[in-house]
């Protein structure tokens, strides 16, 4: 079997860990998400400018705290979200969260391929060039699959090119809005939402959180490559504040002045066709290759097959069904995404509460019942309780019930951790040094 450079079945060894900038561009590219621009348009049309910035700030504070906690766990262990799930759901039981995480990501990959292809066909048609939709679909699918196939190094290279391109293109476009519209700031400052568009602050914060909390659960798949906890947590927190906030801002400005929710369409409306296509492609690319990478890791945990071959299969399926997924599957994918946040809450409960005295323990419970029951209850609450923030409601309930059920059912007291089944312990010298200091004390 070929060497697994993505460590889909084990922890990332210390010598393969990466520094701040390599991790930062990957995480920033991860947060450059087109769906966040759609949410930004909704927020921009539904809030005053002061409440818009407050909602984005509060929402990203919560998202940043959640993803930073997952980043801390990943860098401490060197494990992907799927291998972290083994520690609470058990080896067989971890197939459940892996499937919940992997299947929507394959679907979103297909949607992203179509999202890239349709505007390109439209742009070319406006220039008098007829193009069959399957040409950009196939090209996009191959591009996005290739970087996911080659793993974290390829994801880093794509992000190194894409992140500056998106930031410069979006920043220039926003600046052009104010240059072309002298009263733009007054328009923003004096804007008052009316009718069905108006949002309460709590609803706006819920939208901000909901736009990325499911994707954010996959954070460990990337930051497990960070050299230490400080790099993992800081790059994650900063990326969510900068990347997510920029996407909301671009969406709000585009929606208000150009009646579109995507910065690439704004660039085209401003007469910048080629930059628009470039920004569109890069913006979707940095999200899609990450989605496919995560789905490959999830299926590798379920099947035991190498991640890179599973990425090829998932990428091929997503490309073939891209148009169908785009037209019929978005609503279904959004429903599936409500199943994901309770998984992250259970992983945190296991790491910070159940294993708090021995976070390096890779004991795999012989009985995954506590995690499965807690996930089921958290998912039901997230879907049917209408008060507060749905995703957070589900997470809080799943967290509490997991800790409770571990006490009721015995949890790790029934653990079995054969070396060939349990994920290997992460090699992190800084952790060992801390442990020695504690022993001396």
Predicted regions located by residue number:
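Juxtamembrane transmembrane-helix boundary signature
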Residues: 56-89, 98-104, 110, 407-415
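C-terminal membrane-solvent junction of multi-pass transporters and transport-like membrane proteins
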Residues: 14-17, 344-419
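Membrane-interface "cap" regions at the ends of multi-pass membrane proteins
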Residues: 1-50, 195-205, 224-231, 408-425
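Membrane-water interface regions at transmembrane-helix termini and the short interhelical loops
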Residues: 42-46, 72, 96, 118-127, ...
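Membrane-interface loop-to-helix entry segments
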Residues: 117, 135, 139-177, 236-240, ...
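Hydrophobic alpha-helical segments and their helix-loop junctions in multi-pass secondary transporters
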Residues: 148, 164-191, 204, 208-212, ...
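Transmembrane alpha-helical segments of multi-pass small-molecule transport proteins
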Residues: 26-30, 98-99, 113, 125-150, ...
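Hydrophobic transmembrane alpha-helices that form the core helical bundles
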Residues: 94-128, 285-301, 342
């Amino acid at each position: 079997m070929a060497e697994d450079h993505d460590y889909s079945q084990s922890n990332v060894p210390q010598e393969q860990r990466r520094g701040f900038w390599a991790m930062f561009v990957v995480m920033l590219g991860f947060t450059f998400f087109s769906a966040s621009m759609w949410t930004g348009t909704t927020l921009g049309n539904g809030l005053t400018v002061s409440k818009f910035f407050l909602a984005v700030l509060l929402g990203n504070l919560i998202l940043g705290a959640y993803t930073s906690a997952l980043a801390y766990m990943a860098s401490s262990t060197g494990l992907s979200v799927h291998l972290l799930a083994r520690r609470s759901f058990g080896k067989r039981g971890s197939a459940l969260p892996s499937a919940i995480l992997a299947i929507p990501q394959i679907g979103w990959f297909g949607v992203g391929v179509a999202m890239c292809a349709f505007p390109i066909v439209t742009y070319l048609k406006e220039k008098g060039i007829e193009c069959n939709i399957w040409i950009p679909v196939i090209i996009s699918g191959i591009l996005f699959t290739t970087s996911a196939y080659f793993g974290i190094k390829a994801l880093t290279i794509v992000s190194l090119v894409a992140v500056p391109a998106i930031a410069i293109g979006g920043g220039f476009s926003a600046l052009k809005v104010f240059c072309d519209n002298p009263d733009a700031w007054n328009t923003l400052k004096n804007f008052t939402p009316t009718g069905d568009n108006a949002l309460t602050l709590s609803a706006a914060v819920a939208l901000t959180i909901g736009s990325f909390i499911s994707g954010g659960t996959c954070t460990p798949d990337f930051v497990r490559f960070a050299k230490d906890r400080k790099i993992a947590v800081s790059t994650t927190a900063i990326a969510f504040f900068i990347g997510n906030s920029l996407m909301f801002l671009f969406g709000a400005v585009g929606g208000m002045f150009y009646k579109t929710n995507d910065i690439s369409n704004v660039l085209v409306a401003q007469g910048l066709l080629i930059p628009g296509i470039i920004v569109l492609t890069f913006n979707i690319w940095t999200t899609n290759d990450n989605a496919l990478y995560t789905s490959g890791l999830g299926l590798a945990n379920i099947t035991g097959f190498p991640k890179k071959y599973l990425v090829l299969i998932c990428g091929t399926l997503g490309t073939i069904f891209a148009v169908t997924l785009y037209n019929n599957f978005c609503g279904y994918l959004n429903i599936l995404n409500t199943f994901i946040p309770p998984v992250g809450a259970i992983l945190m409960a296991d790491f910070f509460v159940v294993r708090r005295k021995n976070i390096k323990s890779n004991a795999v419970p012989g009985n995954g019942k506590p995690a499965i029951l807690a996930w089921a209850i958290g998912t039901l609450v997230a879907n049917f309780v209408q008060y507060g923030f749905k995703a957070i409601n589900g997470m809080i309930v799943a967290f509490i019930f997991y800790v409770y059920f571990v006490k009721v059912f015995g949890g790790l007291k029934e653990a079995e951790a054969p070396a060939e089944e349990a994920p290997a312990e992460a090699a992190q010298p800084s952790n060992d040094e801390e442990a020695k200091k504690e022993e001396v004390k």
